[in-house]
Amino acid sequence: MTHIEREVKIKLFSPPLSVLLTKLKNKYTFLGEESQKDIYYNSPVRDFRQTDEALRIRKSNGKIELTYKGPKISSQSKSRLEINVEISNLEDMDKILQNLGFKKVIELEKTRWNFKVNNYTISLDSVKGLGDFLEIEGIDVDEKNLLNFVNNFLSENEIKGESTLKSYLELLVEKIEKTNSDPN
């Protein structure tokens, strides 16, 4: 399926994840909890870090998807083309990609709690090695409407944090590179 995904990602400062999770469960439609494992790849013909693309296999509660994400198309939100294909076998897809020259970049694990509010999906993410985040996502939604919704949602729920346009992949790679280059 092809669509434009628009999202805003916020590194949570307050309230703590457990408090926010309880608050949102009492206030909004809870869609469930997911354990996700993502494997990211880089292309043999171009560097996805340079082209701002991503290719991953995601395993989430027994479902496996291959996802291509195109370059970001906005400086206000993380908006990009996204194509998802359900696959039946993670190991075989991994072998296909590696035999085609794709290289594994990193594996990322997170626990995600999803909520539905109007036309938006609200996700609380606890990302191994990175901490806690809030994502507000709309599919094929107007960017201005998304940004207004985000501001109102944060204010209404007294959420403090820092917005980032970087993906979890970018944040984790940066953290690893910083750790590896830090002489201390």
Language-model features: locations:
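C-terminal accessory/tail domains of diverse enzymes
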Residues: 60, 124, 144-145
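Residues forming anionic-ligand binding surfaces in small-molecule and nucleic-acid pockets
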Residues: 69, 129-133
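Short glycine/proline-enriched loop/turn "hinge" motifs that connect secondary-structure elements
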Residues: 123-129
